[in-house]
C-alpha cells in the first residue's frame, strides 16, 4: 500500500510540476501557436527591411541615371519635341497676329495719303491692276528685301507689299506686278502717239482671214510678185499693223488690187474689206464669175457702159481704116498702153503662126494696137464715171484694177476681126507711103513706153534690150522707105510695099513679146 501511496504522491507531485512546466514552457519550448506568431513578427520585420532597402536602392539608381544622362532617352526626346512645337506655335501665332494688324494700319494710312496727295500718272494705272497677274514678283521682290526682316520666305513677300506702300514705293510695286512687256505698254500712256495705239490694238483683233490673205501674197508667181513688190520689202510687223482697211496707204491699195487681177483666189479673200464700197465689192464678184474660157468666148463684163460697147465695135464695122487712121488713136496715155501691151501676149501666138500670110499678120498687128488704144482710153474714162471710187484708192490704182482684164477681153474680141480681110484688100486700103512711115513712127511710140510699163509690171529686165532692137529695126525701115519714095511717084499707092516693109518689124515685135 505504501508503494501505491508513493506512486500517487509522485503523481500528485508530478502534476504540479507539470503545471509549473506548462506555465514556463513558452519560454523554453512553447506551443506551436506561439512559435508561429513569433515567426510572423520576424517575417514582417524582414519584409519591411527589404522594402526599405529596395526603395533606397531605386532612388540611388534614379539619381545615377539623372546625373549620367543615360536613362529614359525616348522620354526626353518626346519632351523636347513637344516643347519646341509649343514654342514655334507660339511664335507663328504672334507673327500672324502682327501681320494681320500691320497691313490694316498701313492700308488706312495709304488710303489717307491717296486722298490727300495725288499720285503720278505712272503709278495710277498700276494701282488698279490686281496682284493675280504678277509673274515675276519672286524675282523682283529681292530688291525690296533690305527693308523686311529675314525670317520666312512668305512673310518677306507680304511685308514687302505692306511696308513699301508709300507713294514713291507704290510705283515700284505696281511695276513689279507686271511682266516687262506689260510695263512698257502701261508705263507711259501720255507719250504714245495714235499710230502706236493702232499698232498695238490691231494685232489683237487680227483675224485669221487676214493671215490667209498675207499667205496669198507670198504664194504668188514671180511675175505677180514683181507687180506686188511692197509685201516683200515690208517687215512682218508692218503688214500686221497696216492690215486694217483704214490704215492702208494708196500704194498698198494699188498692189492689192493688182494681185486681184492676176489670181483667182485672191479676189475671194480680198473682196470683203470694209473700206471698199458696195460697188467695188460687186466688181470682183463679177470678175470671178468670168473665167478664162468665158473670156475666150467673147463675154462682156458688166463694168462697161453701152457707149463703150459702141466705140468698141467701131474697128469691126470700118474695113477701110488706113495706117494713118490707125495712128490717130495711138495717142494714149503711156500708163494705159503698156498694160494693154502686156495682156495681148496670149494672142500673139495667133499672129505669127502663119508666116506666108505676112500681110494678114501686119494687119492684125495694126488693128490690134488701134483697138487696144481705144479700149484702154474708153475703159479708163468711162469706168471711172460708172463705178464709185473708194476712199483710199487713187485714179492710177483704179486704172490698174479695171484696165488689164477688160482690155484683154476686148483685144481678144477685136483681134480676130481683121483676119477676114485678104492681103490684097489690105494693100488697096493702105494709103501713101508717108502715112506708112507715120505708122511706123507711131508704132514705135508705144514701144518706147514699154520699159515704163514693164517697170510697173516687173518685167523691165526682159524687154529693155528687145525694145532697143525694135527701135533700130524701125529706123532701118524708115530709111528704106525714104529711098523708095524718091524713086516712085507720090500719086501711086505704095500699099504692097508698106506692109511688106513693116513685116520685119512685126517679127521683131513678136519675138520681143515672146
Curated annotation (Swiss-Prot):
GO cellular component, one term: nucleoplasm
One of the GO biological process terms: cell differentiation
Region feature (Necessary for nuclear localization): 7-87
Expressed in which tissues: Expressed by bone marrow cells and osteoblasts. Also expressed by ameloblasts in tooth enamel (at protein level). Expressed in enamel organ, ameloblasts, spleen, bone marrow cells and osteoblasts.
Region listing for Disordered, in residue ranges: 1-96, 408-514
Keywords linked to the UniProt accession: Developmental protein, Differentiation, Nucleus, Phosphoprotein
Cleaved signal peptide residues: none
The keyword Nucleus belongs to this UniProt entry's keyword annotation: yes
Biased composition (Basic and acidic residues): 441-450
InterPro entries on file: Hemogen (IPR033272)
UniProt keyword Transcription regulation, yes or no: no
Phosphoserine, modified sites: 90, 124, 153, 166, 179, 207, 221, 259, 264, 277, 305, 415, 422
Positions with biased composition (Basic residues): 61-79
Subcellular location: Nucleus
Predominant location: nucleus
Residues where Phosphothreonine is found: 322
Function of the protein: Regulates the proliferation and differentiation of hematopoietic cells. Overexpression block the TPA-induced megakaryocytic differentiation in the K562 cell model. May also prevent cell apoptosis through the activation of the nuclear factor-kappa B (NF-kB).
The protein's name in its UniProt record: Hemogen
Gene transcribed to yield this protein: Hemgn
